[in-house]
Regions:
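Active-site loop signature of alpha/beta-hydrolase-fold enzymes
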Residues: 105, 196, 229
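Structural motif corresponding to the early beta-alpha repeats
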Residues: 64, 68-171, 257-260, 270, ...
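Histidine-acidic metal/acid-base catalytic patches
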Residues: 6, 16-24, 28, 36-46, ...
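Active-site acidic/histidine proton-transfer and metal-coordination neighborhood
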Residues: 23, 28, 109-221, 300, ...
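N-terminal secretory signal peptides
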Residues: 1-13
Length: 312
């Protein structure tokens, strides 16, 4: 059965058809040029997924921003008094909190027969409003535990995950969330494709792009996780095809999922993806979402990763 993707109008396109269209966009300068992100000029920004205790060190090494967890940063279950103090703590740090991940906790069900979008929408809306107040640009929507389609559907009498219906439920959630936060101006939710052994829906950048195109909201974009792309053998052409939808990236080394530069022999695998980012004029963030090591090695590894990324 071909890999499928949600597309405008509720139809499906298989992976081969999408790759052909992506290759066409890449090959025609007039098309690829009109698909570049809205931001112009500048350069790619580099950050790391770490907590606030590490931000001072990251700043001294030369990183541009940091990325934290939504629950830790904004905790939508806590009151406004807590949030005001938290917002001040974030603002006092020497680097901007540009992105956050871990958007929807696994306690919420977004797909399957027991999906209940109401509580998850309330949680997500409050998180996004706090994220905008804090100056966050992108909130990463991976959340495999919440989005993975459970196996308790029945298809033609056979129990199993109804992936197509699950993707529609996920897209419906994105659509309603974007409607609720249409008044926001800067923060965007970015759909994170996860490799197949972590999620049974939205495994490729081109699939996330189809949902974005259908929802058609300025509050929704795409994330390209270069580690997941390498593991899923997804071509860098998907980055070019995503073009204007691409708002954030993650990266980790190929074999061990450690910091960039931890495996000198595999660094060359990053180059096609960075060439694609440069081809579309990408000036968003690239966060190291990876293992770092401990103790004295940690600072050295932060430096190694940043040097590696700047050379690409």
């Amino acid at each position: 059965m071909p890999q499928v993707s949600y597309v405008n109008g509720g139809g499906f396109v298989n992976r081969r058809e999408f790759i052909i269209s992506a290759a066409a966009v890449t090959a025609v300068p007039e098309l690829s040029g009109c698909r570049t992100p809205a931001t112009a000029g500048g350069r790619i920004l580099f950050g790391a997924c770490r907590g606030p205790d590490d931000v001072k060190l990251m700043s001294s090494v030369g990183y541009d921003f940091w990325e934290w967890n939504v629950g830790a940063a904004f905790d939508p279950d806590k009151d406004d008094e807590w949030w005001k103090a938290q917002r001040d703590r974030i603002a006092a740090l020497p680097l901007p909190l540009r992105s956050c991940n871990g958007f929807i906790p696994g306690k919420f069900r977004l797909t399957g027969p027991k999906a209940d979008h109401g509580p998850a929408l309330d949680y997500a809306e409050r998180a996004l409003r706090r994220a905008e107040e804090a100056g966050v640009k992108t909130v990463v929507f991976g959340s495999g535990g919440a989005r993975n389609v459970p196996g308790d559907y029945t298809i033609a009498g056979v129990p199993g995950p109804d992936v197509e219906k699950g993707v529609r439920q996920y897209a419906d959630f994105c659509r309603e969330l974007c409607r609720r936060v249409a008044d926001l101006r800067t923060v965007q939710v970015v759909i994170e494709p996860l490799r197949p052994n972590e999620s049974n829906i939205i495994n490729y950048v081109w699939q996330a792009e189809q949902i974005c195109a259908d929802v058609a909201s300025p509050r929704l974009g795409v994330l390209a996780d270069i580690f997941h792309m390498m593991m899923g053998r997804e071509s860098a052409a998907s980055i070019v095809a995503a073009g204007k939808w691409l708002k954030h990236c993650h990266i980790a080394s190929f074999a061990t999922r450690n910091f960039p530069g931890a495996e000198p022999e595999t660094v060359s695998r990053f180059k096609p993806y960075f060439d694609a980012l440069k081809a579309i004029g990408y000036t968003g963030g690239v966060s190291c979402e990876c293992g770092w090591g401990k103790g004295e090695d940690y600072e050295k590894n932060l430096e190694t990763a940043l040097k590696c990324l700047r050379r690409l």
